[in-house]
Amino acid sequence: MRNLEDIAWITQAAIFHNRAAFGRLVEKYQAQVRRFFLSQTLGDTQLSDDLAQDTFVKAYLNFSRFRGEASFSTWLFRIAYNVYYDHVKTQHPTDSLETPAVMGRSGRDTDSGLQMDLRHALALLTDAERTCVVLQLMEGQSIDHITMVTGMREGTVKSHLSRGKKKMADYLRHNGYDRQ
């Protein structure tokens, strides 16, 4: 039934320009979108908030392009994915997201060692690997959903997941996180 709620809110927002309905969609999905950006930016809360805001603005302005062929969340994450990669493309080579200054940034001063190590492990991944790993492991998305969001083929997504998980496991194992 949650999907029916989305359809009702989308209809209200798109056809009747009902801002309250759009607000309900933002409330429902903002935590997921923000988590996606926090993982992609390795904990940069300010940048994540800016990118999330850009995502919802673009979604609002482009409601007419939502055809309902996929779920609203898939469409929204596709916008988020594009917003992030547009941001990455505009960065100067020296503005890498994998610098220690960015990796140490967080909205909380009480990050556990594990959270910091996970952030460092994510920093080792390519952007494509990080996107696939974040969507699957942190957002619980299926491979089919990831292929729709990223536009990658299923085999490519599986390959990025395999390599990304291996890199992260190797890093964490090297830093004392053994499976027991």
Regions found by a protein language model. Give the residues of each.
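Arg/Lys-rich amphipathic alpha helix in sigma70-family domain 2
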Residues: 61, 65-68, 78-98
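Structural recognition of an alpha-helix C-terminal capping motif at a helix-to-coil junction
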Residues: 50-57, 70-82
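C-terminal edge and immediately downstream basic/flexible tail or linker adjoining helix-turn-helix-like DNA-binding
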Residues: 2, 43, 148-151, 166-180
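Amphipathic, Lys/Arg- and hydrophobic-enriched alpha-helical face
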Residues: 26-45, 62, 122, 174
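Helix-turn-helix DNA-binding module
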Residues: 123-131, 139-156, 167
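Internal acidic/polar
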Residues: 3-7, 86, 91-120, 142
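Sigma70-family region 2
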Residues: 15, 41-43, 54-71, 90-91
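N-terminal module of bacterial RNA polymerase sigma factors
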Residues: 1-32, 150, 177-180
